């Protein structure tokens, strides 16, 4: 992981199920990164109020959970909405930022009242100008997330069904392209002729 992500040796990386790791640890962290969600492959045990509460318990007082959502759906009742509503039900502050050039959304969750001032101060302390510029861009795109009623729990986490909705949307989008090509150019357009 250190080689792949270019992390310095001072960063500790644990590669295992995040919930199991946290359950066995009393350690607290400044940042916990969760990167486990991709369209239809959503681990239910990393999607519930109970999981996000466990993450919250392992954050230092000014700590932040950063979640990478690699999802294409932003529809009402989507897996994105369920995950963000669930996070917002646990943390005092939840903000999102779209990632330029792809379908990812970064979600930042914290209980620190001064999170934005801390974020800006941290950017000001960066010595890598490119990284500082990128983080300023992220800050400009941050949008507060107001939680709703779509909450996932250990007892109710229909992530497979929600993932299938995403798959249906993906297939529908692909089929629309081919239907449009067939309507405008006929069969020869589809066959490249």
Model-inferred region functions:
Residues 1-64, 70, 74-80, 88, ...:
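The AdoMet/dcAdoMet-binding core of the Class I SAM-like
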